[in-house]
C-alpha cells in the first residue's frame, strides 16, 4: 500500500519578502512558516538542515533571464519561508511566482529574484510539527504566544497576546512587528484614540487595546486580514466598543483624527499614504515594515510633515516613531 505523500517548498526572497509572502498566501491559502537554520538546529532537524544546505536551489531572476532554472546555492542561506501542501504545486505555483516577479519589475522598475527548493515526503502530522515550531516570543512588554502554548502565570493578562500564526499576517516573530511593538510599549496610550493601518492579524490593534486606548480604528485592504483581526480579538477576549471599528479598505474610508497611528506595511505603500497620514494624524505616527534600502526615500517624503523622534532597526528592517509638526494641518 502506497503511503500518502505531502510536498514541502522552501523559498528565499532576497527583496520584498512580505510582498512575496502575501502573494503565496493569496494564491495557495496555505499556512506559511518563516524559519531559519538556527530554528532548525534548535529542533534538531538534521534531515532538513542537510537537505537545504547541500541541495542546489532553483533560481529565477527577472534581471538575468539567462539564469532561469539554473541550480545554485543562495548567497545568504539563513532565513527562508516554508510552505507545505498535499498537492504538488511545482507546475502551478512556480510559474505564478515567476509571473509575479515580472509584474513587480514592471510596476516598481527594479529587478526581482527568488530561490526555491521542493521535496515530497511520506505524510506525517506536519500541522503538529508546524505548531511545535512556533514558539512564544517576548516583544518588549508583550508575551506573544499561540493558543497551544500556555501563558506563564507571572505574565499579566494585559501583557499577553495570543496569536495563532496560520496566515502570513504578523505573529510577533517578524522583525518589523517586534520593533513596532517595542515602540508602542513605551507610550502612554490611556484615553487616546488610535488607528492601525494594514492591521493584518490584528496584533498591533490588540496591543493598542491592552494599553488602554479609548477608541480604536483598524483597516486592511485584504478581507482575510479583517477576518483574522476579528478572530484574534475574540481569541484575546477583546470587546469591540461602539466607538471601535474594523474596516475592509484603506485610509480613504477613515474619518476623524487620531492621537496615535501605527502602520506596519511595505515602504512603497507607506510613501503613497503620506498625505493620508497628514490628514489623519494628530500627534504620533509609528511606521514599520521599511527595508533599510528604502529608508532614505521614506524620510525624504515624510520630512516636511513629521519629525523623527526615534528610529529602531533589527537586521534589515527599520521602524520610525514620528511626531507630526504643528505647522502642518
UniProtKB/Swiss-Prot annotation:
Keywords: Cytoplasm, Methyltransferase, S-adenosyl-L-methionine, Transferase. GO terms for cellular component: cytoplasm. It comes from the Bacteria. The keyword Transferase applies. It catalyses: L-lysyl-[protein] + 3 S-adenosyl-L-methionine = N(6),N(6),N(6)-trimethyl-L-lysyl-[protein] + 3 S-adenosyl-L-homocysteine + 3 H(+). It is found in: Cytoplasm. InterPro entries: Ribosomal_L11_MeTrfase_PrmA (IPR050078), Ribosomal_PrmA_MeTrfase (IPR004498), SAM-dependent_MTases_sf (IPR029063). Its main location: cytoplasm. It holds the Pfam family PrmA. S-adenosyl-L-methionine binds at residues 177, 198, 220, 264. One of its GO terms (biological process) is methylation. CDD domains: AdoMet_MTases. Its EC number is 2.1.1.-. The keyword Methyltransferase applies. Disulfide bonds: none annotated. One of its GO terms (molecular function) is protein-lysine N-methyltransferase activity. Methylates ribosomal protein L11. Belongs to the methyltransferase superfamily. PrmA family. This is Ribosomal protein L11 methyltransferase. It comes from Helicobacter pylori (strain Shi470). The gene is prmA.
Amino acid at each position: 500500500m502506497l503511503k500518502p505523500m505531502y510536498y514541502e517548498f522552501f523559498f528565499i526572497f532576497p527583496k520584498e519578502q512580505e510582498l512575496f509572502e502575501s502573494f503565496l498566501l493569496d494564491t495557495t491559502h496555505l499556512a506559511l512558516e518563516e524559519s531559519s537554520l538556527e530554528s532548525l538546529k534548535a529542533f534538531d532537524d538534521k534531515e532538513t538542515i542537510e537537505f537545504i544546505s547541500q541541495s542546489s536551489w532553483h533560481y529565477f531572476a527577472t534581471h538575468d533571464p539567462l539564469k532561469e532554472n539554473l541550480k545554485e546555492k543562495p548567497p545568504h542561506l539563513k532565513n527562508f519561508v516554508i510552505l507545505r501542501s498535499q498537492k504538488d504545486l511545482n507546475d502551478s505555483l512556480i510559474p505564478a511566482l515567476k509571473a509575479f516577479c515580472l509584474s513587480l519589475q514592471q510596476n516598481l522598475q527594479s529587478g526581482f529574484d527568488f530561490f526555491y527548493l521542493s521535496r515530497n515526503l511520506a505524510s506525517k502530522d506536519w500541522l503538529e510539527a508546524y505548531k511545535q515550531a512556533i514558539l512564544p516570543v517576548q516583544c518588549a512588554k508583550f508575551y506573544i504566544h499561540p493558543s497551544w502554548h500556555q501563558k506563564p502565570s507571572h505574565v499579566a493578562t494585559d501583557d499577553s497576546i495570543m496569536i495563532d500564526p496560520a496566515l502570513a499576517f504578523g505573529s510577533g516573530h517578524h522583525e518589523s512587528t517586534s520593533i513596532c511593538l517595542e515602540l508602542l510599549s513605551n507610550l502612554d496610550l490611556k484615553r487616546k484614540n488610535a488607528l492601525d493601518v494594514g492591521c493584518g492579524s490584528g496584533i498591533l490593534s490588540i496591543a493598542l487595546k491592552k494599553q488602554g486606548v479609548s477608541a480604536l480604528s483598524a483597516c486592511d485592504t485584504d478581507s482575510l486580514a479583517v477576518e483574522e483581526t476579528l478572530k484574534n480579538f475574540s481569541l484575546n477576549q477583546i470587546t469591540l466598543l461602539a466607538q471601535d471599528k474594523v474596516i475592509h479598505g484603506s485610509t480613504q474610508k477613515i474619518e476623524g483624527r487620531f492621537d496615535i497611528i501605527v502602520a506596519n506595511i511595505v515602504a512603497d505603500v507607506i510613501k503613497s499614504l503620506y498625505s493620508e497620514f497628514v490628514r489623519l494624524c494628530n500627534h504620533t505616527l509609528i511606521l514599520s515594515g521599511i527595508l533599510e534600502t528604502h529608508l532614505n526615500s521614506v524620510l525624504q517624503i515624510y520630512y516636511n510633515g513629521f519629525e523623527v523622534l526615534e528610529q529602531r532597526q533589527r537586521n534589515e528592517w527599520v521602524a520610525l516613531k514620528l511626531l507630526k509638526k504643528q505647522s502642518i494641518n
